[in-house]
Amino acid sequence: MLPRHGRYDFSPITTRPDYNWPGGKRLAFCIVTNLEVYAYRKGFGWDPAKTGEPQNQRNYAWRDYGNRVGIWRLFDLFDQLGLPAAHNINSLLYDDHPQIFERIRARKDELVGHGRTNSERQGDLWEIDERRLIDDVTDTIRRMEGAPPAGWMGPAASESNLTPDLLKEAGYRYVMDWPADDQPFWLKTRSGPLLSVPYPAELNDSASIIHRKDNGRDFASMIVDQFDEMIELSTAQPLVMTISLHAFVIGQPHRLRHLRQALQHCVQHPEAGRVWWTTPSAIADFCYAQPPGIIPGEGPSSDPRQR
């Protein structure tokens, strides 16, 4: 018997109900950065030059560039274009990077739980240890921000077989680990539905540039092509376009220039008035407010206490 996840049923996008995003918009556009902290010379972590290179001072420093330099250039770019953003954050980032959080708060951006550090993978943990990890991250963000995060993105999209169950039980409303659709859909958990918000495995600078060896111009072209195609497709159905950015990758000057041009193309597009420039939590709030049957999958009942 083929192993199955049991989290959602098959649903062709052509057979689903139509609806509009807030304000009659048709394409929801999200930018999500990944703000990460790594162990020095230990654990997991990418290398900018050599695939599979052991952890050393060079690849540690390259990744730290994102927090010291890259994210600040991204903040400025988002400000210039008037774009909101969400940020997948490792909770250990709070230990030494207060200025990053000050800027996020000033921009009123969203924080998404992203594990403690990208040097570990929650998919390798026993249930009790994974629950402890999720609780640790949630409690840290709640303590520092006054409220827990609504969403979760696993470090390197890592999940165990129980992750959606544990997230639902910890109070999370959505997850971004399942790149199976261009629309949000409901995941089944042992404690009720959990929303899956689209997050890209492909329109992702780490996947494109580090793993597929594309350059900054290639990645920017992907953004433009994705936007142009999805703005056309969204005439038939409401869609979500999410861009995943890592500050130590796209924040390098030779790539940042191309990202700026791509995002300018999007905000200046003739059909930009049909776009909802938003965040994953706003998408989740919208979906939870819909009556049963609108969002694919088995969602919350009509009882508002379950929303």
Short names for language-model regions:
Residues 2-110, 228, 258, 265, ...:
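Active-site beta->alpha N-cap acidic-glycine motif
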Residues 2-23, 139-237, 291-296:
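Active-site-adjacent pocket scaffolds in enzyme catalytic domains
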Residues 12, 174, 224-307:
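C-terminal domain-boundary segment and adjacent tail
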Residues 53-55, 72, 79-160, 192, ...:
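Metal-dependent polysaccharide deacetylase catalytic core of the NodB/CE4 family, i.e.
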Residues 77-81, 103, 107, 140-144, ...:
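Alpha-helical structural signal in soluble globular domains
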Residues 97-98, 161-164, 253-259:
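Conserved strand-to-helix beginnings and helix N-cap segments that scaffold or border functional pockets
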Residues 108-120, 131, 168-183, 303:
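Acidic, His- and aromatic-enriched active-site or binding-groove loops in soluble protein domains
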Residues 125-133, 214-218, 254-258:
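Alpha-helix N-cap and loop-to-helix initiation/capping positions
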